[in-house]
Amino acid sequence: LLGFESGLFVSSGLMGNQISLLNHTNPGEEVITTQDSHIKNYEHGAASFLSRIQFRNVSHNDGDLNLDDIVSQISKSSYYKPKISTVAIENTHLASGGTIIPFENIKKLSEFTKSNNLKLHVDGARVWHAILEENTKANYGKYCDSLTFCFSKGLGAPIGSMLLGSKDFIANSREYRKKIGGGMRLSLIHI
């Protein structure tokens, strides 16, 4: 799906995003994102509670991170500052009115993250809106390490989200989902 090897049902986008951070980070590290991103501001402080990480803000244009700003943040890293391990983007960007990050820009960001040994996570709660608007196949799996999308946003389902990634990433994610109470054993067919 979307070019990823594997996927995992999770009860919410918040759970999918947080499981991604648990996989991609170690305690004390930083995640680059926008000041007004959902993963930073609207997930009840879950990242600091579960992963014990913090966020580093970069400038953006309607959700599209400024690559030059990311480069400068990476170059400012030092022994005295937390290690930056992950970049988290949101497509579409809710706080910017649902604006779309062009897929070509995601490819450029991916090239940068890979060359700097960083993980790239997409909070794609509304990713189907972006794919339809851009009229693209959007092979996110080729360019991103993980992606979460919501079944109720754009697809009309009553509950749940999917977390996508590599087979190893999803195997680890399945364990994290169980540890934080997301197995939903009695409410759904075994997933």
Please annotate each region the language model reported.
Residues 4-31, 40-44:
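Conserved beta-loop-alpha segment that forms the PLP phosphate-binding cup at the N-terminus of a helix
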Residues 8-11, 33-34, 57, 88-89, ...:
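General beta-strand structural signal in soluble alpha/beta enzymes
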Residues 25-85:
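PLP-dependent aminotransferase-like
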Residues 47, 141-171:
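Active-site PLP attachment segment
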Residues 65-122:
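Active-site phosphate-binding strand-loop segment of PLP-dependent enzymes
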Residues 100-111, 115, 126-146:
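Active-site pre-lysine segment of PLP-dependent enzymes
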Residues 189-191:
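Conserved small/polar residues in nucleotide/adenosyl-binding loops
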